[in-house]
Amino acid sequence: MTDFIPTTDLSDAQPQAQVAAPVLRDFGGRTRFQGAAVTLRISENNPLVRQTLQTPGAGRVLVVDGGGSLNCALLGGNLGVFGVENGWEGVIIHGCVRDTAELRELDLGIRALAAHPRRSGKLEEGERDVPVTFAGVTIRPGDHVVADEDGWLVLGAESP
């Protein structure tokens, strides 16, 4: 992993940085994380999240557009463990998580809208490696995502 540069410094130095609206909460045990984005677009079903977190993360960040659903959780403790075991830096979800006490203990950055006790559906549907837009930013596969105590932002893959 490269040296961490705080989001405040990046937003000052990189005017092209897309700064996300402060709508997501921090649920993971790691507050600061960064990496290349892997994107998913799903709707209240999380098998693609599971499948992705079971692959080598190689220091990347999984960005999940769950459509902003507040009806169920797209990530819980078991999937969070897969993320840690497979080297993911973090997960950003435009949707909900559950098992928040477990997630807080993991060495994984996790941002989501809220906590919800209901599990997601198990249909294998959705899209991977597509541009996703939420919180006022568009994230493309390979874009650099940086998150810390002050928020999160997106730099294009070509940015330093």
UniProtKB/Swiss-Prot annotation:
Bound cofactor: record note: Divalent metal cation.
GO molecular-function terms, A-Z: 4-hydroxy-4-methyl-2-oxoglutarate aldolase activity; metal ion binding; oxaloacetate decarboxylase activity; ribonuclease inhibitor activity
GO aspect biological process, one term: regulation of RNA metabolic process
Chain sites annotated for binding a divalent metal cation: D99
InterPro entries tied to this protein: RraA, RraA/RraA-like, RraA/RraA-like_sf
Cleaved signal peptide residues: none
EC number, as in UniProt: 4.1.3.17, 4.1.1.112
Cofactors named for this entry: a divalent metal cation
Chain sites annotated for binding substrate: G76, G77, N78, L79, R98
Catalytically driven reaction(s): 4-hydroxy-4-methyl-2-oxoglutarate = 2 pyruvate; oxaloacetate + H(+) = pyruvate + CO2
Any matching Pfam family: RraA-like
SUPFAM superfamilies on file: RraA-like
Name of the top EC class for this enzyme: lyase
Entry similarity comment: Belongs to the class II aldolase/RraA-like family.
Record text on subunit structure and interactions: Homotrimer.
Function: Catalyzes the aldol cleavage of 4-hydroxy-4-methyl-2-oxoglutarate (HMG) into 2 molecules of pyruvate. Also contains a secondary oxaloacetate (OAA) decarboxylase activity due to the common pyruvate enolate transition state formed following C-C bond cleavage in the retro-aldol and decarboxylation reactions.
Protein name, per record: Putative 4-hydroxy-4-methyl-2-oxoglutarate aldolase
Native source organism of the sequence: Deinococcus radiodurans (strain ATCC 13939 / DSM 20539 / JCM 16871 / CCUG 27074 / LMG 4051 / NBRC 15346 / NCIMB 9279 / VKM B-1422 / R1)
